């Protein structure tokens, strides 16, 4: 069943509960990257054009079910106000008298943003009573929060059973783009998977084996693979409990005819911080007392050749310790190589997107996915609760 679409629905004068993903990075009370806010604007502009009265809900960070000013949406609302032409109001509470009163006072095309839904533990518990209180604010539900679609929470799943429910434009685009990757990718299909832990990527790697032609591994997870092949990795991050599974993945790739590539050289550091001394080492391995912090120039060159000839590219996860300036080189090189490729390109995950933005090549990428965890779970072949709920009839 296809997702129910917004475009042909009459929403004039109706209150629309719009779940978005405004989970943006904030430093010293200021939003440092507004990409996720900007990505929802087409849906918001469509709702304004339709004369809807919009109630926006989002989570921000992990306040653990308690009100915590550090995770307030107030600074996000200030940025959001500068991106839309409509009147924007802010409710300092999620449920109760204030949001109900403000939602009833909205005029067509006006927007109310309610406070962080995760200030209530019932949100993450998907507690039915809390879902009902959210649903009481509106007549219609729209989910545009693909980044939270893998969570069965009250504002992403529970409420969808209580109101007529639709997919927002961003949600629909994400599902279409990622579905096409799995269904009919142009060949060769290259997946570039990085990040620190192999444990968090095992399922997606397993699901990709019968779909991709090349699998390029980077980031901290590469050292668990290398250790499983008896390559010296010094003090690098290794998940000992996953060495056997990493070795089995290498074997499985061989059987499936997938070209699985691991780093052949490394930028290493003598400590895990910005003050680390650094050097480059190749296939002899990493010395004791040193740790792998980024892929080396030979690895970059190997990966660039494969990327250049790709028909489809999926990238999730950095090639090194991207949060430290000394070790961003590999990730930045991959970002630039992908941007020069003629392939269809899909990028997901916070650090990968940050590298694309830092390299100023976002306009060269076919699709930048707003959901790190959600896009990975989708690529694992799993059903996303927030998406499945949109396909169901409203509870009587």
Swiss-Prot record:
Pathway: Carbohydrate degradation; glycolysis; pyruvate from D-glyceraldehyde 3-phosphate: step 2/5
Biological processes per GO annotation: gluconeogenesis; glycolytic process
E.C. no: 2.7.2.3
Positions of ATP binding: 201, 292, 323, 349-352
A GO term from the CC aspect: cytosol
Residues engaged in binding substrate: 21-23, 36, 59-62, 118, 151
Source organism superkingdom: Bacteria
GO terms of molecular function: ADP binding; ATP binding; phosphoglycerate kinase activity
Enzyme class: transferase
InterPro entries attached to this UniProt entry: Phosphoglycerate_kinase, Phosphoglycerate_kinase_CS, Phosphoglycerate_kinase_N, Phosphoglycerate_kinase_sf
Keywords for this protein: ATP-binding, Cytoplasm, Glycolysis, Kinase, Nucleotide-binding, Transferase
Catalyzed chemical reaction(s): (2R)-3-phosphoglycerate + ATP = (2R)-3-phospho-glyceroyl phosphate + ADP
UniProt subcellular location: Cytoplasm
Protein family membership: Belongs to the phosphoglycerate kinase family.
Subunit composition and interactions: Monomer.
PANTHER family reported in the protein's UniProt record: PHOSPHOGLYCERATE KINASE, PHOSPHOGLYCERATE KINASE 1, CHLOROPLASTIC-RELATED
Protein name: Phosphoglycerate kinase
Organism (species): Leptospira borgpetersenii serovar Hardjo-bovis (strain L550)
Name of the encoding gene: pgk
């Amino acid at each position: 069943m296809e997702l129910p679409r917004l475009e042909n629905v009459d929403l004039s004068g109706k209150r629309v509960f719009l779940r978005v993903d405004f989970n943006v990075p904030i430093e010293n009370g200021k939003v440092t990257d507004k990409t996720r806010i900007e990505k929802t604007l087409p849906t918001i502009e469509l709702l304004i054009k339709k004369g809807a009265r919009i109630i926006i809900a989002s989570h921000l960070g992990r306040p653990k079910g308690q009100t915590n000013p550090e995770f307030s949406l107030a600074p996000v609302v200030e940025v959001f106000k500068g991106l839309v032409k409509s009147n924007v109001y802010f409710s300092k509470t999620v449920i109760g008298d204030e949001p109900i009163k403000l939602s009833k006072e909205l005029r067509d095309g006006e927007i109310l943003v309610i406070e962080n839904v995760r200030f209530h533990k019932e949100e993450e518990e998907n507690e039915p009573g809390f879902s009902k209180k959210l649903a009481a604010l509106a007549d219609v539900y729209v989910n545009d929060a693909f980044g939270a679609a893998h969570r069965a929470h009250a504002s992403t799943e529970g409420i969808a059973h209580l109101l007529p429910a639709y997919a927002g434009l961003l949600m629909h685009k994400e599902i279409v783009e990622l579905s096409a990757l799995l269904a009919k990718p142009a060949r060769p299909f290259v997946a570039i998977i990085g990040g620190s832990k192999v444990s968090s990527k095992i399922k997606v790697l397993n699901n990709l084996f019968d779909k991709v032609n090349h699998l390029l591994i980077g980031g901290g997870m590469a050292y668990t693979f290398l250790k499983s092949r008896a390559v010296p990795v010094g003090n690098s991050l290794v998940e000992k409990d996953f060495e056997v599974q990493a070795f089995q993945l290498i074997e499985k790739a061989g059987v499936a005819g997938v070209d699985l590539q691991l780093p052949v050289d490394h930028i290493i550091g003598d400590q895990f911080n910005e003050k680390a001394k650094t050097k480059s080492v190749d296939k002899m391995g990493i010395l004791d007392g040193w740790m792998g912090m980024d892929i080396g120039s030979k690895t970059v060159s190997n990966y660039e050749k494969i990327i250049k000839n790709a028909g489809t590219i999926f990238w999730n996860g950095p090639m090194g310790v991207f949060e430290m300036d000394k070790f961003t080189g590999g990730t930045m090189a991959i970002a630039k190589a992908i941007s020069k490729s003629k392939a269809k390109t899909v990028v997901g995950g916070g650090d990968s997107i940050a590298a694309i933005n830092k390299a100023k090549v976002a306009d060269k990428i076919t699709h930048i996915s707003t959901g790190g965890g959600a896009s990975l779970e989708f690529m694992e072949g799993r059903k996303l609760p927030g998406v499945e709920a949109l396909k169901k009839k409203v509870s009587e």
